[in-house]
Amino acid sequence: MTQDEMKKAAGWAALKYVEKGSIVGVGTGSTVNHFIDALGTMSEEIKGAVSSSVASTEKLEALGIKIFDCNEVASLDIYVDGADEINADREMIKGGGAALTREKIVAAIADKFICIVDGTKAVDVLGTFPLPVEVIPMARSYVARQLVKLGGDPCYREGVITDNGNVILDVYGMKITNPKQLEDQINGIPGVVTVGLFAHRGADVVITGTPEGAKIEE
């Protein structure tokens, strides 16, 4: 089974959590694209979706799924999204696709966060995957200096502007032994919009695509 087939297995397995008549929170990325394909088979049965990115919105609309603005809904039953890394405590690094801020907002209003990944994303300690930080452009250099003080090696993601009009710093060399503390520290730097650490709001359900199929941990 290829990596993409494992992603597909995870994405389609998440469909069991979708309730008829509900509005579904939808993330961003290659694994989520498989979930969106699956959700398309229920387009007549759900009310619609709240999307975390322009890319996912376009894909959902192409399948006839109505898009709701985040401000139109008080809460969501579920939010389905992938991760770049996930540890045993279900804390994650996300934001490789630069949609971290909107992903964090949609995750915050969801009752249940369902993380869909392939087996390569599970790690003992977060930080091998570079940690994305969304930054207001004028604060880029200042934030980078503060990230160095925290032990990181920040790298400006050239040519990338987020859906919110900001830039991304990818922080290398972080061995993240206390994700919640680091999330607070980085979010406290003036000019940071948010960091791609999902520690305070981790996953409630993890669906992992494996060569044997989807493995669900609730």
From Swiss-Prot:
The keyword Isomerase applies. It comes from the Bacteria. The active site is at 103 (proton acceptor). One of its GO terms (cellular component) is cytosol. Substrate binds at residues 28-31, 81-84, 94-97, 121. Keywords: Isomerase. One of its GO terms (molecular function) is ribose-5-phosphate isomerase activity. Pathway: Carbohydrate degradation; pentose phosphate pathway; D-ribose 5-phosphate from D-ribulose 5-phosphate (non-oxidative stage): step 1/1. One of its GO terms (biological process) is D-ribose metabolic process. The keyword Isomerase applies. Transmembrane segments: none annotated. It is an enzyme of class 5 (isomerase). Its EC number is 5.3.1.6. It catalyses: aldehydo-D-ribose 5-phosphate = D-ribulose 5-phosphate. Homodimer. Belongs to the ribose 5-phosphate isomerase family. Catalyzes the reversible conversion of ribose-5-phosphate to ribulose 5-phosphate. This is Ribose-5-phosphate isomerase A. It comes from Vibrio vulnificus (strain CMCP6). The gene is rpiA.
